[in-house]
């Protein structure tokens, strides 16, 4: 997710065309500290809060990079491809994902965020063994079909942050 979001920003900065849609599954949107879930959801999630800070340090390496330079949430998010984001409500990243979706929307990006309340980081990997995973994967397929002109209906079982595709826009 982090790489996909940062790539969208760099593609736009290079003046290249954006894709029809960007999918972000449980994206890491801030390399610093953000939100209570980052450490408060450690008891639920296989990915732990301290790991996000460690990964941020690895990403910086010996370079002069700051969290702001490496965090999708700190970028100019206007004029990006439409974004469809999925997250688990029990994952450590959920607060920063919500913050990112709100910030992208505030900057004019078309965003849809679906949060499955009892799921952890990248719950999609469970496939057909969990109904929520299967529902999320079905929604991803619908999002891809949306780029071809089909409708993409809101999901009733997920938390909604009032950002959706129901008006024909992402």
What are these regions (language model features)?
Residues 1-170:
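Alpha/beta-hydrolase superfamily serine-hydrolase fold, recognizing
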């Amino acid at each position: 997710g982090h790489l996909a979001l940062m790539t969208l920003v760099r593609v736009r900065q290079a003046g290249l065309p954006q894709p029809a849609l960007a999918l972000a599954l449980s994206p890491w949107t801030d390399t610093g500290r953000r939100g209570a879930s980052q450490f408060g959801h450690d008891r639920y999630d296989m990915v732990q809060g301290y790991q996000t800070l460690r990964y941020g340090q690895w990403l910086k390496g010996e370079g002069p990079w700051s969290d702001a330079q490496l965090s999708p949430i700190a970028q100019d998010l206007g004029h990006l491809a439409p974004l469809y984001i999925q997250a688990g409500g029990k994952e450590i990243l959920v607060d920063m994902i919500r913050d990112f979706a709100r910030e992208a929307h505030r900057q004019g990006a078309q965003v849809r965020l679906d949060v499955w309340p009892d799921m952890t980081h990248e719950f999609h990997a469970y496939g057909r063994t969990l109904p929520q995973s299967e529902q999320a994967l079905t929604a991803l397929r619908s999002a891809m079909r949306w780029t071809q002109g089909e409708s993409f209906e809101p999901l009733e079982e997920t938390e909604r942050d009032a950002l959706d595709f129901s008006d024909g826009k992402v």
